[in-house]
Amino acid sequence: MNNKVKILGDKIAEARFKRKFLPKISKSLISNPNIAAQICRHAEMELLWNPIGFKAGATNKSMWKKLKAKKPFFSYLYEESTYKNKGKMPFQSNLIGAELEVAFKIKNEVFNFNKKITKSNVSKFIIGIAPAIEVVGFRQKLKAIDCLGRMISDFGLNVAFVTGKLTKYSLKKITSISTVLTNNTAKKNYPGNTKIVLGNPINSLIWLLNEIRKNNMILSFDFWVTTGSSTPIIPIKKGDLFSGSVKGLGSVSLKIS
């Protein structure tokens, strides 16, 4: 790991911990997804927060051409940025928006499994499924996503995470189900579908489980995986109340106070 990676990782970790903004990082330093991933891994190591799972990002293939992406990315989810269903989180000026996702609770036994995770064996590691809202934002002074590496290096843009009730659900039924993220304050509905998540949230889950095992990112407890947004990113204002519904899975809500 070179010195520039360490310096940028340190700065991004400090910005997240102290909830402060960094000046815009030069695109040339983070445009390579592999370098951006190294920056993220170092920032995660320096943050010293408590991981509770992982998030997959860039799972909507229709965005890959714009982002020049060849595959998704992943980063940690943290206890310190997790909120209770129907709870409140403080507004932050760096917020981009809210997303509605499908989340899985996974047995940590998956790390002892010596074979590749596939559709035929993944179900043995799934404890349950839940709807989830992820709030995303920057730790830098900028207004829009200009490259994939900026998303990857900045903790995958994760700011907050909340899940609804965990439930059992047939994996065969999750391929294409309707979702709706609602801004109750603005009285606007934003429909979506799980099929935009790599064609199926299970595909995203399988990809992520194989990636974290390959990178030796082992957790000693059962953990969460969010698979990517089933809706557009919905802008956030202070006072907004968001509720999300995934057909057959239930609902989840979060107030931005």
Regions found by a protein language model. Give the residues of each.
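Catalytic-core "active-site belt" of small-molecule-metabolizing enzymes
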Residues: 2-200, 206, 233, 238-241, ...
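A conserved acidic, glycine/proline-rich C-terminal tail/linker
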Residues: 201-233
